[in-house]
Amino acid sequence: MGKVIYRPKGKAREYSPWACNLYVGCSNDCSYCFNKRGVLGTVMGGPVPKLKSCIKDNFEAYSTFLSEVQRYRDEIVRDGGLLFSFSTDPCLPETVDLTMMCVSTATGMQIPCQILTKCTSWILNDKVTAQALLLSRDLLSVGFTLTGADDLEPGASPNSRRVEAMRFLHDRGFHTFASIEPVITFGDSLRMIRSAEPGCDLFKVGLLSGDRDAYAGYTMPDDLETFVEEVNGFLTKKGKPVYWKRSVSKALGHPVEGACCVGAGYDILNPSKTTRQ
């Protein structure tokens, strides 16, 4: 694989078969961030976003992206698209300009793209950036991580602002999704789903990984089962799809089923062509 475009493995592959990582580090400073863990935590999970060490400046970053996206274009399109990003928030003030340049290039090549972020300033404060993507919206889906736990994400935009930004994009014809991952508390996650639903086209729900005591205050899997039933009931009434990630199925001991449930391959850009579970 290339310096910036690659095929994710493991749990990350549930999000996208291809991803682009231009930066490492993130100023959102989320306490649960996976990138902060392990021997590479000081590099991957640093508090300041920096270009990857193999890239010297933005010019080289874009040139590298252009070369790699041209090389892998047909495979990326065949597999469903390209995600920005697993190693940082792609819409931080330090990262958004290069991200948008690469997204515009990729969608101009008819490559579907996903953006996953906790930032809203590029939409709510600087609407020029969002407006510039209007021509790409048929090939672009924008997702916001919603936990309802602002105290665990001190550098990120408040969850309420993310819901507002999602609605802003949705009202302008953008495809939107909510990443309800990690679930911190079932109550907060259900509240986020209810709040985001009017401006959201797809929900993805996953549990916190790597912390055995994360749900010590709950009776598992019974309380998780109740949460799943509440979410499925609400989204079925609203006609909105939800993808329950493998972490949920594993904790329950069985796959999650329901009229609103979809698989990992659900195509938010072409929902009518996607078979639901």
PLM features: residue spans?
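Feature targets compositionally biased, intrinsically disordered low-complexity regions
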Residues: 1, 9, 79-80, 142, ...
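N-terminal [4Fe-4S]-dependent radical SAM core
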Residues: 1-81
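Short loop/turn segments at secondary-structure transitions that flank enzyme active sites
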Residues: 26, 36-39, 90, 148, ...
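Short linear functional motifs in flexible/disordered or boundary regions
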Residues: 38, 42-45, 96, 190, ...
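Conserved AdoMet/S-adenosylmethionine-binding subsite of the radical SAM
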Residues: 63-234
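C-terminal accessory extensions appended to soluble enzyme cores
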Residues: 215-277
